[in-house]
Amino acid sequence: MPKLDSKKEKYLKQIVENFIKTGESIGSLNLKQSYGIKKSPSYLRAIMNQLEKEGFLEKSHSSSGRIPTLQGFQYYAEFLSFDENENLANKLKDLFARRRINIENTISEAVKLISESVGTTLIATTNNENERLMSINLTQISQNEGIIVVVSSSGNVENKKITFSEQIPRQDVKIAIRLFQERLINTPLLEISSKLAILKQELEKQIKHSDELLHHFMEKIFNFQVQNKSNIYNKNSLILDKEISRAKLVDLLYIIEKKSIWEMLEDRTTKDDDTLKISIKSPEVSFISKKFEKFLPIKEISMVGAAKKINYSAARTGIKLLEDFLSNKSKIRKG
């Protein structure tokens, strides 16, 4: 896509933002009046003619004004949508300042705010790579059975039944649980199996059937695997949008529920950020996808909506503030 000079960028930005706000075309006189531009309408008309010839604007069928083309929206989204959206920024900063809210609830509320402000359906993908063991306890429920309660740093609670036997006696399980409480708390869930091998010698000093017990814990209790989870917010934004055909809607609902939008967009990274992809290929749909650093709890955020209705500056504002918040939280935890 050719890079425009600063003069053309200024007026294209105003025309696109006016259309996002009003949904209407704009002529040179209205552009001058709306933005207090000191140039004459004829000067602005000449600039708009140039932008039309270059494929960034087109004439509206219902008036003499012009509206952005898909290329105009793509250019705006990639190069001109960096102004902070003050309304969303203030809401997010207020949310992030509430120390009483746990991190998971904060993230959930933040992405809801972003989705509503941008005017899109938003998909937030997380996984358990960074989850840690926060507690492990045994509750006996009968003479021969117990429940091992495992709590992770995300607040996830798993209840796993254990049957006591000659090879796995109740007293040995209690000893093992006590050792795990001393040595495994705050260990990443996906590293627990490897740490159990280190604890084997310590267990052998205290219990008779350490091999059988360790094998049971590795197979039945600490059998954690990488799991991706996608939460969808503001789905009605897609479902109720009259500009999206029913056939396209079916395709989009399948995509947001079954696929990684980041991977689907292939090489659509923006010039300024190789972790951000923006794709505007039809009036019906625009995709925005952000890949987060591995150590952060969110792996990917993607937004889907009608190309000409999305508030692109709000999208950038929300993504940046959320990324900054999560990065700061991660540094505090590591420190």
UniProtKB/Swiss-Prot annotation:
Family annotation (InterPro entries): HrcA, HrcA_C, WH-like_DNA-bd_sf, WH_DNA-bd_sf
Transcription regulation in keyword set: yes
Pfam families according to UniProt: HrcA
Ranges in coiled-coil conformation: none
Keyword line: Repressor, Stress response, Transcription, Transcription regulation
Molecular functions per Gene Ontology: DNA binding
Transcription regulation in keyword set: yes
Signal peptide stretch: none
A biological process from GO: negative regulation of DNA-templated transcription
Record-stated family: Belongs to the HrcA family.
HAMAP family xref list: HrcA
Chain's role: Negative regulator of class I heat shock genes (grpE-dnaK-dnaJ and groELS operons). Prevents heat-shock induction of these operons.
Protein name per UniProt: Heat-inducible transcription repressor HrcA
